[in-house]
Amino acid sequence: ENMLRKFLRVFGIGALVCGGMLSLPCSKSEAAVMTPPFATDTFPSDFDVCLYLHPAYIMQQNEVLVRVKGSDFPGTSTTVRREVNATPGFFGTDTVNTEFVSMHLAGGVVTPGGFFGAPVQFKVGQNNGFRPGLGRSPGQVAENAMTPLNGQLDVFPANSVFDLFIDVWVDINVDDLVQDGEVLRNYDQSLRMANPTLRGFPPPAGDFYELIGWVDPSDPKLGEFGATVNTSRINFYVVNPDGTTSNFLAAQIDPLDADCPHTHTITPEPTSMVLFGGLMVMPILRRFRAGNRTLPV
């Protein structure tokens, strides 16, 4: 803990996750444009993820792998919106665009050692971060079955993906204050989460999303099927107070790490309501912070 406090004094900045990307090209993307009317789904969820903490960030000789677990911040639920009307998508089936409106998860490091118990929180949703400029986290859901198009996404299980930009806050000194050096963001690599067997709207308890890689924010299909999904490590950088990146690499996530889970699971009692006017998540962490193989998704 003393080491972490010392580090905080040295590096007074923060932000990890592609969520901070909106101050960059994220907002330029025309991908996954939402067309009203919309439906809004809310549901409880939890996460389980592993992070590789960069040596320079933790002031150690080697990177450190930590596992982080948690669930919805008390009094909140994950909220996503989706188009009500479907159109033929990448696979030629009824498809709707989706977007994380808000997600606030909280938990801590469960790996034994010097980082054990460190509280961490993360936020998803446009301008909903711990620092200004968090980008939107778009996605799509498409029917798997090649049934006749009817303008409605009503055949399940369906295929769902999201590209997430995230703010991660690690409350190192446990004072409940978001301070410089405690926030990280994935500015240039959106986290691609996938659930190829989504069972309904809202997603029922037991459904889960897995991290499968990342999509470049400049990809014209950001948030859509057909984007180039890279499976190298995902970079998280310290965020400046104004939401810009410090370019200080703090942590990474390895989507191909077979020894660590990278999941977001739906837990009981989701609800759904229709709105007129305009899915899913991932992990949280604590002070932390990558290549290029591709997957056809």
Locations of the language-model features?
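C-terminal segment of classical bacterial N-terminal signal peptides
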Residues: C18-K28
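Short, intrinsically disordered, low-complexity terminal segments
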Residues: G12, K28-S29
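Bacterial N-terminal signal peptides that target proteins for export
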Residues: N2-G14, P270, F288
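Hydrophobic helical h-region of N-terminal Sec-dependent signal peptides
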Residues: G12-G20, L279
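C-terminal membrane-anchoring or membrane-association module
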Residues: P283-V297
